[in-house]
Curated annotation (Swiss-Prot):
Pfam families in the record: GIDA, GIDA_C_1st, SAM_GIDA_C
Residues at which NAD(+) binds: 273-287
Residues in the signal sequence: none
Biological role: NAD-binding protein involved in the addition of a carboxymethylaminomethyl (cmnm) group at the wobble position (U34) of certain tRNAs, forming tRNA-cmnm(5)s(2)U34.
Gene Ontology MF term list: flavin adenine dinucleotide binding
UniProt cofactor(s): FAD
Coiled coil: none
Gene Ontology terms describing biological process: tRNA methylation; tRNA wobble uridine modification
GO CC annotations on file: cytosol
Organism: Haemophilus influenzae (strain 86-028NP)
Name this protein carries in UniProt: tRNA uridine 5-carboxymethylaminomethyl modification enzyme MnmG
Family statement drawn from the similarity comment of this UniProt entry: Belongs to the MnmG family.
């Protein structure tokens, strides 16, 4: 049975990738359908109740800069905000919010239900319809067929998901939700490379059974950060603390004595887990010299008694989980509400994707989120946004868009996945970016909002506010560079009181601000440089741009050198077998990866600079290089 309407874009899955993937084409004016097995779990935080962190906060800001939802929802739901690495340089500072699960889900659902051009339908997708290697629609469990010009698949951990608690296991997409088995079989039939990954979650503890009085408190920042460029502190709900406890030798003994009942250590689980979020049994065995691990007790919400013990993800049997929990300080009498578990699921090799996240094999079919081998809400949201944008551009027969590595962390993420692939759940870190001084949280809107405006992703109110901010930044910089202080100035004594060394030659406001002891607030407290502007976002940009000008210019010069051939396109039908001078190994890798550009080809393991030169020569011979390349 066919549904009466035809859609431009269908998105399968209502998690963090799916919600962004559905909103993007709808904002672009395209008729979009979001298919989910349960509308009540839209935007569900399946694991830890937190958004952001090192690298991850950067992704949230980038999604927000392009009109995405995650930052807005985090502001509405955040019950503890912190700026991580606040004492370090601006490149690695990151925002993190502890979130109320219910408020977060409400914010997501409200945004989806009020988005023009977006329909939501509750039904499990069981098949993707394809004709002549081109997607044509989706069929569901009840036999209803939806026709569409493009499809974005964001199935999370649901594809052939299997939940493990001890040596018992059963099919499931997450606790309480069914796995998507039929769709997994269908995707395997398409000839895409598939493998298994694993992730896990800790048991949830009843707050009423925890002795918080003997535990250390962790409060949020006194000056609360805001995630969205359009948000404000007034969006935040009540702020509450987290608490800290530790594992101990008794905890570790309980774990070591029960490894024969662990699905990971008995070979029942074959999928590889996330390196940077290991289970407690992994931590105890891998770091045997440590007699304690820090555990954060994170509240799941303002109206919930559930507590998330961050740091004890486990798939050990329930009785062992009780032993682990009750062995820790403050948790001696704690009761588990939900057991921890591990989940294995299918993921598809992201090297079979274009950088737009469209599959190379099927036109109009896009993948985003954990199906591509990533871990984390933020990584999923960034991919969902990108896939949704390109699904919309595909429908309109417009040129695809994807960010470069020097343009955003989303660009780093996608390039890493599509070029190198992954054998373990991939997460973003600031260390993965070569040009991280340019990819800061604070300038995500400067980097990406103009592009979002061109693509039709943001409204005019947001665009006007962005332009006002840019005008303030430029006006203030011009003001500071036009006001000079010289050794004979009547204000010299006032300035020398705050300068590390006396002023001996004429200096502009920008020159003074470059001094390590000087800040914008100190500078604008001096009589010649009063008054300060009130917009703190603009102040931050002015200060960073001036203080780090030399470093920023150096990185931009490096980028320009690199870009000479970075974006040189390699045609999809380029025949490497006819390129003489390439080794068989290099030729095989290029045939396997089918890189879309010289830059992508250069990052494939084993592809030498000499091989790149040979390819460039052949592209030039065949007239495939543009003038100047």
């Amino acid at each position: 049975m066919f549904y009466t309407e035809t859609y431009d874009v269908i998105v399968i899955g209502g998690g963090h990738a799916g919600t962004e993937a559905a909103l993007a084409p709808a904002r672009m004016g395209l008729k979009t359908l979001l298919l989910t097995h349960n509308v009540d779990t839209l935007g569900q935080m399946s694991c830890n109740p937190a958004i952001g962190g090192i690298g991850k906060g950067h992704l949230v800001k980038e999604v927000d800069a392009m009109g995405g939802l995650m930052a807005h929802a985090a502001d509405k739901a955040g019950i503890q905000f912190r700026t991580l690495n606040s004492s370090k340089g601006p490149a690695v500072r990151a925002t993190r919010a502890q979130a109320d699960r219910v408020l977060y889900r409400q914010a997501v659902r409200t945004a989806l239900e009020n988005q023009p051009n977006l329909d939501i339908f509750q039904q499990e997708a069981t098949d993707i319809l394809i004709e002549q290697d081109r997607v044509t629609g989706v069929s569901t469990k009840m036999g209803l067929i939806f026709r569409a010009k493009s499809v974005v698949l964001t199935a999370g951990t649901f594809l052939a998901g299997k939940i493990h608690i001890g040596l018992e296991n059963y099919e499931g997409g997450r606790a309480g939700d069914p796995a998507s088995v039929n769709l997994s079989y269908r995707l395997r039939d398409l000839g895409l490379r598939v493998d298994r990954l694993k992730t896990g979650t800790p048991p949830r503890i009843d707050a009423r059974t925890i002795n918080f009085d003997i535990l250390a408190k962790q409060h949020g920042d006194a000056v609360l950060p805001v995630f969205s460029f359009m948000g404000s502190v007034s969006d935040h709900p009540q702020q509450i603390p987290c608490y800290i406890t530790h594992t101990n030798e008794q905890t570790h003994e309980v774990i070591r004595n029960n490894l024969d009942r662990s699905p990971m250590y008995t070979g029942v689980i074959e999928g590889i887990g996330p390196r940077y979020c290991p289970s407690i049994e992994d931590k105890v065995m891998r770091f045997a010299d440590r007699n304690s691990h820090q555990i954060y007790l994170e509240p799941e919400g303002l109206t919930s008694n559930e507590v998330y013990p961050n740091g004890i993800s486990t798939s050990l049997p329930f009785d062992v989980q009780m032993g682990i929990v009750n062995s820790m300080k403050g948790l001696e009498k704690a009761r588990i509400i939900k057991p921890g578990y591990a989940i294995e699921y299918d993921y598809f090799d992201p090297r079979d994707l274009k950088p737009t996240l469209e599959t190379k094999a099927i036109s109009g079919l896009f993948f985003a989120g954990q199906i591509n081998g990533t871990t984390g809400y933020e990584e999923a949201a960034a991919q969902g946004l990108l896939a949704g944008i390109n699904a919309g551009l595909y429908v309109q027969e417009k040129e695809a868009w994807y960010p470069r590595r020097d343009q955003s962390y989303t660009g780093v993420l996608v390039d890493d996945l599509c070029t190198l692939g992954t054998k373990e759940p991939y997460r973003v870190f600031t260390s993965r970016a070569e040009y991280r001084l340019l990819l800061r949280e604070d300038n995500a809107d400067i980097r990406l909002t103009p592009i979002a405006h061109e693509l039709g992703l943001i409204d005019e109110a947001r665009w006007a506010r962005f332009n006002q901010k840019m005008e303030k930044i430029e006006q203030e910089r011009q003001r500071l560079r036009s006001i000079w202080l010289h050794p004979r100035s009547e204000y010299l004594e006032e300035a020398n009181k705050v300068l590390g060394s006396p002023l001996v030659r004429e200096a502009s406001g920008e020159d003074l601000l470059r001094r390590p002891e000087m800040t914008y607030d100190i500078l604008t407290s001096l009589t010649p440089y009063k008054p300060a502007i009130e917009d703190r976002e603009a102040v931050e940009q002015v200060e960073i741009a001036i203080k780090y000008q030399g470093y920023i210019e150096h990185q931009q010069e490096e980028i320009e050198k690199q870009k000479r051939h970075e974006n040189t396109a390699i045609p999809a039908n380029f025949d490497y077998s006819k390129v003489s001078g390439l080794s068989n190994e290099v030729r095989a890798k290029l045939e396997q990866h089918r890189p879309v550009s010289i830059g992508q080809a250069s990052r494939i393991s084993g592809i030498t600079p000499a091989a790149i030169s040979i390819i460039l020569v052949n592209l030039k011979k065949q007239g495939m290089l543009k003038r100047g390349e």
